[in-house]
Amino acid sequence: MKTNELANAQLTRRTFFKLSAVTAFGATIVGLAGCGSSSAASSATAGSSSGGTLTMLNYADWMGVDEVENFAKQYGFTIEELPTPDGGTTAWVNTLTSNKGTYDFALAGNNVAKRLKENNLLADFDASKVPNLSKVASTYTSEFPYGIPCEQGKIGFYYNKRLLSTPPTSYKELFAQASSDALAGKILFPAYDGDVLDAGLLALGYDVNSATAAQIEEARDAVISIKPYVKAFIDSGAPSQIIDGSAAIAVGYDYDYAYAAPESEDIGWIAPSEGCPGYLDGWVPLAGSKNLDAVYQFFNFHLEDENYADFINTTMASWIIPEVKSLLDPDVANCEALDPEKNPGTFYTQNDADKTAQYAAAWQAIQNA
């Protein structure tokens, strides 16, 4: 992949993953039918009539290459994917409120799904209709009770191995060493308030999910104190700068690293000792749908090993069904940033309206400093 193609891929993925907290964009309309294979596991869900269209709120191309065609062949239902809205969680609530009954199911991060549930926009999820959900560890299903969790993302460090023989292995070390000759002016952070302030909280030893206003202010000040040594807060292109040596270390996303790692042996991944802030994304059934039985069939179909592996290979996301690892492409299966077993300290961030407002104010202060 060329450098500019890598940067473009990172930008679109970066925006998508913030479904879980603030933003999302882009989509395509897809209605396909084609060839596929049958499965006893898929037929386990009952009650769906054959034929019709399921309408999904989804990010562009966030689907296995063959999933839609194979499901259409087996069940007669096509999947129409409509665009996720700009404007954050409020836009999601407004879109689904004004179009109740139009959509059958949606992609949503754990924080977005929680807000949809609070606004009575989700159908009650019946896990008994998705037998393949048993393949997903309870760690994930308990964090995402609104539907089926599909994948996860996490934030760690990636660094240039040539420049740093002993890189920081924690947020505390990163902040403490920011002014050193090895790191000063060569540190990259995401241009996103939550990720930056989470880093500050972790560096201070705080729990990002129970932070008080005073702790958020401390985190703000900690970030401001190292800002002179930060090269940039950027949306995309961090791995390219790590590889070419213009930056030494970045706080960044596992999927960015997964794209970049096959391109260079000079880039390495670190799961910080405090843990990796993460998020779950999944599919949720929507209130007002007249096709919930078919929705459950598609949920179950998605979690079959071959279909789920197709999804992970296409999206290069971190998987949550351990058994599919042997079916994944080598660049995905062997990526230490994506492998859940190599990142056991991942935890999932929770946001509410008050915390979101506090983060926004703190981020503005960081930008103004």
Predicted regions and their residues:
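N-terminal secretory signal peptides
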Residues: M1-T15, V22-A33
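Early extracytoplasmic/lumenal segment of secretory-pathway proteins
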Residues: A46-R115
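A ligand-binding cleft/hinge motif common to bilobed small-molecule-binding domains
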Residues: A113-K117, I249-D266
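Periplasmic-binding protein-like
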Residues: G153, E217-S225, E263-A287
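Conserved C-terminal helix/tail region of periplasmic/extracytoplasmic solute-binding proteins
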Residues: E341-A369
